[in-house]
């Protein structure tokens, strides 16, 4: 569960390293976001000479959360960190690679491009 002020790692090769959630999209009173939800982030750390700079604001999709997610078969899946992938205006990923595993719930949220770029889908 991601809420405002939550720090996340950026799991793509755009050059950003750490981001902070500044808004959970999908309703004026919405407080939490889970895997597959779109949030607005601000880049807090970035590597030099990258396409994203510190202080830039983007939309991102959540690909990993530390809070467990219950699946229909009764199993739970959770990850070691909270991570997101930066999106462009068309809600497709800005980067060409996705680092680390991503959750299968992204398939249900219609982020097939992110799933295909990921090295491992759990």
UniProtKB/Swiss-Prot annotation:
One of its GO terms (molecular function) is large ribosomal subunit rRNA binding. InterPro entries: Ribosomal_uL14, Ribosomal_uL14_bac-type, Ribosomal_uL14_CS, Ribosomal_uL14_sf. Keywords: Ribonucleoprotein, Ribosomal protein, RNA-binding, rRNA-binding. Pfam families: Ribosomal_L14. PROSITE patterns: RIBOSOMAL_L14 (PS00049). GO terms for cellular component: cytosolic large ribosomal subunit. SMART domains: Ribosomal_L14. One of its GO terms (biological process) is translation. The keyword Ribonucleoprotein applies. Belongs to the universal ribosomal protein uL14 family. Binds to 23S rRNA. Forms part of two intersubunit bridges in the 70S ribosome. Part of the 50S ribosomal subunit. Forms a cluster with proteins L3 and L19. In the 70S ribosome, L14 and L19 interact and together make contacts with the 16S rRNA in bridges B5 and B8. This is Large ribosomal subunit protein uL14. It comes from Borreliella burgdorferi (strain ATCC 35210 / DSM 4680 / CIP 102532 / B31).
